[in-house]
Curated annotation (Swiss-Prot):
The keyword Zinc does not apply. The complex is composed of two ATP-binding proteins (CcmA) and two transmembrane proteins (CcmB). Belongs to the ABC transporter superfamily. CcmA exporter (TC 3.A.1.107) family. GO terms for molecular function: ABC-type heme transporter activity; ATP binding; ATP hydrolysis activity. The gene is ccmA. It is an enzyme of class 7 (translocase). It catalyses: heme b(in) + ATP + H2O = heme b(out) + ADP + phosphate + H(+). Residues 20-222 form the ABC transporter domain. GO terms for biological process: cytochrome complex assembly. This is Cytochrome c biogenesis ATP-binding export protein CcmA. It comes from Xylella fastidiosa (strain 9a5c). Pfam families: ABC_tran. It is a peripheral membrane protein. GO terms for cellular component: plasma membrane. SMART domains: AAA.
Length: 223
């Protein structure tokens, strides 16, 4: 399966350098081409939506950008720097998988403190405020394994809100969210974009309507 790149929507170029630029990325599995070649960039103050059906390689792309997989060819520039190390990417990128990256035997609040110990968090935000934002104040001491799927998703959004990373990679963040959760995610994304952060998010279906500047990267099967 080969993914082709369709040019993003036309927008005036940003005066600031891209938060991330991908150059001729390719990836294959068992000698079968999966992705590429892909060329795109993510500017400060905007969201890039990666759209395509399930199985097309959206999650693979995010894992490559996050440094969890290696592309077969091409390279990625982070803040115009080539070949960044894993710690540098961790400081620059927050990756929210479609599977919650939570410690099941820690409480909701302990999970947020654990995140701080690993990566730090936004200097003007606290774990307690994050739990309030996502409506989990009453579950601060509840073990994650005792939370519902919806509550775990909200806790993941609290982790995201606390992240100091300027670039967010979000794998199908709107999946399984109720209308209130969609409003909450839009609020978090808007706050991030308005502070000149950048976001790349994936969707298998219709392009989500976001209250921020967006561009589109459409992946499809090669003819």
């Amino acid at each position: 399966m080969l993914c082709q790149y369709l040019p993003p929507d036309d927008r005036p170029p940003s005066s600031a350098p891209p938060l991330l630029a991908a150059h001729a990325l390719t990836y294959s599995r068992n000698a079968t081409p999966i992705l590429g070649p892909l060329h795109f960039h993510i500017n400060p103050g905007e969201a890039l939506i990666v759209q395509g059906p399930n199985g097309i390689g959206k999650t693979t792309l995010l894992r490559i950008l996050a440094g969890l997989l290696h592309s077969d060819s091409g390279h990625i520039d982070i803040n115009t720097h080539h070949n960044t190390t894993a710690p540098e990417r961790t400081r620059h990128i927050a990756y929210l998988s479609h599977l919650p990256g939570l410690k099941q035997d820690l409480s909701a609040l302990e999970n947020l403190h654990f995140l701080n110990a690993l990566h730090g968090y936004h200097p003007q935000r606290t774990p307690s405020n994050a739990l309030t934002l996502v409506g989990l104040t009453d579950h601060a001491q509840t073990l994650v394994r005792q939370l519902s799927a919806g509550q775990k998703k909200r806790l993941s959004l609290a982790q995201l809100w606390l992240s100091p990373a300027p670039l967010w990679l979000l794998d199908e963040p709107y999946a399984n969210l109720d209308p209130e959760g969609i409003t909450l995610l839009n609020h978090i994304l808007t706050a991030h974009i308005h502070t000149q952060g950048g976001t790349l998010l994936t969707t298998p279906g219709a392009r989500p309507t976001l209250p921020v500047p967006t561009r589109l990267l459409h992946l499809k099967k090669a003819p």
